[in-house]
């Protein structure tokens, strides 16, 4: 095998540019994109020939050069971020975007932000306004807080709160609440960035009322309570609640801040889950400032929502960090749309996808699974399809011990689970499954009914028909 001959047989750039198919690509995209693809694919081809020991395979790859250039150009102009089907049963899947936002809410928000809007314009007064005004009254009405604002995520909330209330001073927090929120971002590190000094009290499993009292000095600027929404310590434990911290803080004239993490506005116990502290409860117990995520149990866009006493919220609004951390117009619009649903709990559970998934009873899940299985079987795909029991979970650092009984459609077939899972990730609309006992499963709790037929069609194309095998 003479590799020099193979290298010389690769078409030169000017010959490729004269090709009719390449000319069509230039017209459809741009000369710059096509040239980039040509150079990239030629480099890959040379590298392949350099390691290939099969002359016929090398010639075949040379013959595919134009086709590969076309694919490369198309890939350059195809958005990398795309819709995926979440078949994992994890409702708040961090890697899949956490809370899905309803199509209706997004369309309403898109209508507002696709043109000009009154984002920071007071239509009544005819002058500059606040971007928080669109949802501040709603948040106060729903939670009982005096004032509210939002920044780009909940870590930003903690950063802004501590920078505004405790910069240069000390903040007391229980050792059992020094959480890591994912991606190695930790509460102590966020506190350090705020300019506040951390004072740890208690132990990992036990912190007492007296621990806070004894740690307060003239340098103490706030007491911080962090709800461990992404893990639980069980067994020989004790912690100090907000209602116990408030009297201590009042005595020393310092604020109590609670980071609720996932943040929930309705009691989830009525839907079969254990009690998760609500935002309203925190305010009712006397917390001066409360922060929580917008894209977790609230079911909205990514945001760090801050509510509490007006004097403290006003301090944060004036902090120079606020401009760096502020939310954009799309987030502001989407957040208002989602919060409006909470004016009626029944409406919220129906129209906010996260709440609907959580609240759907097992009987309804079974009905959906049977319907999904029928659609899958109707395609005649080469697979054994059946309904199996499984457990869904909340995910996203929320209610870590909770599992909800669910149902999944399962497709064992001729290819291995690893091979099928890999192929599903590369479909036009990727499908992200879970595996149970070495089988591919699709949990219907996190799959929308409108996607059943599309999923069935994609899998049928992937697996082929039974008679074709």
Regions of interest found by a model, annotated:
Residues 51-101, 107-108:
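Long amphipathic N-terminal alpha/beta scaffold segment
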Residues 80-81, 148, 429-434:
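A short linear hydrophobic-aromatic micro-motif
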Residues 126-342, 458:
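Conserved PLP-enzyme active-site core in the AAT-like
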Residues 1-73:
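Long amphipathic alpha-helical segments
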Residues 10-11, 85-89, 298-301, 404, ...:
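Short Gly/Ser/Thr- and Asp/Glu-enriched loop/turn motifs at secondary-structure junctions
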Residues 362, 366-450, 454-455:
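Conserved C-terminal alpha-helix-loop-beta "cap" of PLP-dependent enzymes
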Residues 311, 319-320, 327-378, 388-391, ...:
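Structural motif of enzymes handling amino- and sulfur-group chemistry
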Residues 43, 47, 87-88, 98-124:
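Glycine-rich phosphate-binding segment of PLP-dependent enzymes
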């Amino acid at each position: 095998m003479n590799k020099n001959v193979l290298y010389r047989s690769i078409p030169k750039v000017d010959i490729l540019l004269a090709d009719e198919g390449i000319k069509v690509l230039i017209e459809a995209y741009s000369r710059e994109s096509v040239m980039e693809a040509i150079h990239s694919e030629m480099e890959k081809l040379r590298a392949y020939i350099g390691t290939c020991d099969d002359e016929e395979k090398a010639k075949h790859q040379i013959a595919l050069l134009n086709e590969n250039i076309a694919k490369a150009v198309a890939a350059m102009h195809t958005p990398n971020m795309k819709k995926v089907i979440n078949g994992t049963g994890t409702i708040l899947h961090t890697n899949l975007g956490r809370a899905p936002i309803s199509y209706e809410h997004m369309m309403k928000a898109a209508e507002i932000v696709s043109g000009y809007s009154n984002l920071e314009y007071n239509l009544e007064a005819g002058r500059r306004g606040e971007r928080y005004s669109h949802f501040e009254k709603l948040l106060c009405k729903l939670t009982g807080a005096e004032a509210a604002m939002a920044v780009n995520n909940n870590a930003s909330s903690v950063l802004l709160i501590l920078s505004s209330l405790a910069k240069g001073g000390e903040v007391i927090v229980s050792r059992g609440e020094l959480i890591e929120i994912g991606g190695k971002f930790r509460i102590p590190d966020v506190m350090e960035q705020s300019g506040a000094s951390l004072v740890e009290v208690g132990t990992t499993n036990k912190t007492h009322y007296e621990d806070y009292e004894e740690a307060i000095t003239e340098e103490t600027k706030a007491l911080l309570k962090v709800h461990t929404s992404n893990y639980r310590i069980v067994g020989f434990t004790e912690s100090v609640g907000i209602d116990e911290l408030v009297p201590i803080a009042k005595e020393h004239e310092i604020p109590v801040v609670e980071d609720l993490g996932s943040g929930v506005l309705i009691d989830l116990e009525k839907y079969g889950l254990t009690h998760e502290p609500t935002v309203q409860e925190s305010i009712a117990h006397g917390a001066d400032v409360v922060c929580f995520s917008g894209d977790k149990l609230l079911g909205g866009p990514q945001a760090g929502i801050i509510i509490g006493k007006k004097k403290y919220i006003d301090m944060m609004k004036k902090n120079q960090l606020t401009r760096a951390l502020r939310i954009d117009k799309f987030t502001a619009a989407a957040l208002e749309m989602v919060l409006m649903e909470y004016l009626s709990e029944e409406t919220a559970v129906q129209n906010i996808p996260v709440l609907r998934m959580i609240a759907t009873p097992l009987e309804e899940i079974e009905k959906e699974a049977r319907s999904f299985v029928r659609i899958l079987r109707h395609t005649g795909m080469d697979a054994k399809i059946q309904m199996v029991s499984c457990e869904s979970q909340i995910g996203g650092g929320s209610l870590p011990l909770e599992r909800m009984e669910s149902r999944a459609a399962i497709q064992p077939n001729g290819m291995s689970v690893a091979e099928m899972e890999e192929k599903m990730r590369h479909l036009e609309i990727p499908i992200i499954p879970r595996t149970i006992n070495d089988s591919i499963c699709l949990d219907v709790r996190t799959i929308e009914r409108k996607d059943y037929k599309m999923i069935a069609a994609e899998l049928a194309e992937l697996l082929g028909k039974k008679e074709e095998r």
